[in-house]
Curated annotation (Swiss-Prot):
GO terms for cellular component: plasma membrane. It is a lipid-anchor. This is Uncharacterized lipoprotein MPN_587. A lipid is attached at residue 23 (N-palmitoyl cysteine). It is found in: Cell membrane. It comes from the Bacteria. Its main location: membrane. Keywords: Cell membrane, Lipoprotein, Membrane, Palmitate, Signal. InterPro entries: Mycoplasma_peptidase_DUF31, Uncharacterised_MG067. Disulfide bonds: none annotated. A lipid is attached at residue 23 (S-diacylglycerol cysteine). The keyword Transmembrane helix does not apply.
Amino acid sequence: MVIALKRFSFLASIATLTVLNACATISLSDKSGEFYINNIPSSAELHRINYDLTFSLGFTNRIQTKKKNEVNFVAFYGTGLLIDWKEGNQYQPFRVYLATNVHVAAGLKNEADYLPYSQPDAELGWTVDFRLGKYTNVKDFVSPNENRIT
């Protein structure tokens, strides 16, 4: 009897969560295909929050080759999500906290990092450039037909 009640309560909780799940109850706009490709969401649209908090991350690593006078550079790109920020002072204007995927973060190499994280890697080198970007010009992504380009 106790096992039957536990099973019933488990199934009831799963059913309740399924019904109350926000992803299942929010309807997206009819123009979802066009929205994802060609539009920046307006402030009234559901996905504007995601757009405002998402940034393009780019960084370049300098790799010393076995030849003394030869240096290679490798570029990495990924997506970052702003999770917090901190107002700074006269020496440090502000600080941002970005979340990203492990495969993106693994490429960031800084010699001044905490020792376990600053081990040299012959394939990645050291990061010499970091870029934070945001696309705001929708016309760059509109299909040629909409731009009347033939």
